[in-house]
Amino acid sequence: MNVSPQLLGYVVYTAIYNVYFHPLANFPGPKYLAASRIPLAFKRLTGEEVAMTYKLHIKYGPYVRVSPDELSTISTAATKDVYGHNTRAGGVPKDFKAYYMKNQRKDGTEGLLTAGDEEHYRQRKVFAPAFSDRAIREQEPLLKKYTDLLVAKSYEKCQTAGKVDMVMFFNFATFDFIADCVFGDSLHHLESMEYHPFLANITATVRFSAMRRVLRSFPILQAIFEAFMPKSMIKKRLEHVKFCDERVMNRLANDNPSHPDFWTLVEHAEAKGNGLTKGEMRQNGFLLLTAATETTSSLMSAITYLLCKNPEKMKKLQAEVRGAFKSTDEMNTITLPKLQYLQMAIEEGLRVYPPVPGGLPRRVVQPGTTLDGSASNMHIQSVVFYSQYASYHSPSHFARPHEFIPERWSQNPPAEFANDRLEAVQAFSAGPRDCIGKNLAYHEARMLLAKFVFTYDIELCKESSDWIKQKVYIVGAKSPLWVKLVKHERAD
């Protein structure tokens, strides 16, 4: 294959410019990453970006240049500039090139994830009451229903098979609960103990989104990919969206739902004349099902694994939960937040295994945008993101960063952890576009974890001993988490 001298010269010139003369040239990082977007793209496609970024921050410090125009940071001060309310003149808005769900509707409708800042604010204001403590208490019977089903069905499966995959069951429980809140009915995974095609497609959708993020940095490759994309793949994606849209519209057509759900309060806003369009409801329904299920089930799987790998922490949590309640019927959204070690275990789980371990990218669009008070080299169109995994495992932020130690979250932590930078953990992001479902996620995690460890003694199977070692395609590529369950017999 002959390469023209002109093309070769252009490639060499571009690489030299990127490494030595680009506005980001004085940020630290390997020269091969600064020279071209290709190495970072390869790491993203192979699921190795997070592992690479962690190692780079250990070597280079709080800022690392990971491609010609992309910076990764673990600076907690910089997160206020990147994600906060006071970004200068809107200088670091969301980088929509990284979000596959952008521009997916023919009518141009966008949801919370992909709407511009002003539109996001309007939609968020409508949705906010649906995620308040009051709304969650109204949805508590649903949450109890599906956590009870998870407890019963996981044990039933363990009895027949000798072990149970908790990744599957946490997927089932979180999806059935959120589907009931979005559709007005679940898809009955916990009853059937089989994956519904819609849930099975979500994992593929997330993986596909990661690939599309890479392709959007290479317009020619993206055009070729879309031109030759198999029709079966396009059809499957359209069917996936259509299924969700139809379910949402069926729920919205029901003027007398059997129980409160996300749309109950949203429809109140609509009645006042400041609600969402039907298209926005459909798009946000799809978003809620995708984002709210995958992340919570990932967190629950990780905490289960980490507790099994640290039996003394498991015993401490079980002692707290079993000492506070005589039965799971006493557990609710009022009593569970009072359990300190339960909350500490969840916070530590989010630190050790953030559900979205990479960075949420923001793109500089205004001159003079600051990072840590310095505006000298943040040129227009550069991208910056806060690398969660790298930050949470940095020895500059945490003592013994790779160990699962809930005690570091105590109001009076052991002296060894007194200087831990707890504010570095921003698993739900930060600022005006942080996760709207944070409150619900905490309540769901408390209920699932408390009932599970109250009811069972849990043993990790050998084949899952290294479960946490995963590649990352936006979220971790989880293998089955095999455990054995033994019912705990109370002395009283």
Swiss-Prot record:
Keyword Oxidoreductase: yes
Cofactor: heme
Gene Ontology annotations of biological process type: biosynthetic process
Pathway(s) the chain acts in: Secondary metabolite biosynthesis
Single GO term (MF): heme binding
EC numbers for this chain: 1.-.-.-
Residues binding heme, per UniProt: 435
Disulfide-linked positions: none
Biotechnology: Radicicol is an important pharmacophore as an inhibitor of heat shock protein 90 (Hsp90), an ATP-dependent chaperone involved in the post-translational maturation and stabilization of over one hundred proteins, and which activity has been implicated in diverse pathologies ranging from oncology to neurodegenerative and infectious diseases.
CDD domains according to UniProt: CYP60B-like
Stated role: Cytochrome P450 monooxygenase; part of the gene cluster that mediates the biosynthesis of radicicol, a resorcylic acid lactone (RAL) that irreversibly inhibits the HSP90 molecular chaperone, an important target for cancer chemotherapy. The radicicol cluster encodes only two apparent post-PKS enzymes, a cytochrome P450 monooxygenase (rdc4) and a non-heme halogenase (rdc2) that could introduce the epoxide and the chlorine, respectively.
The name this protein goes by in its record: Cytochrome P450 monooxygenase rdc4
Gene behind this protein: rdc4
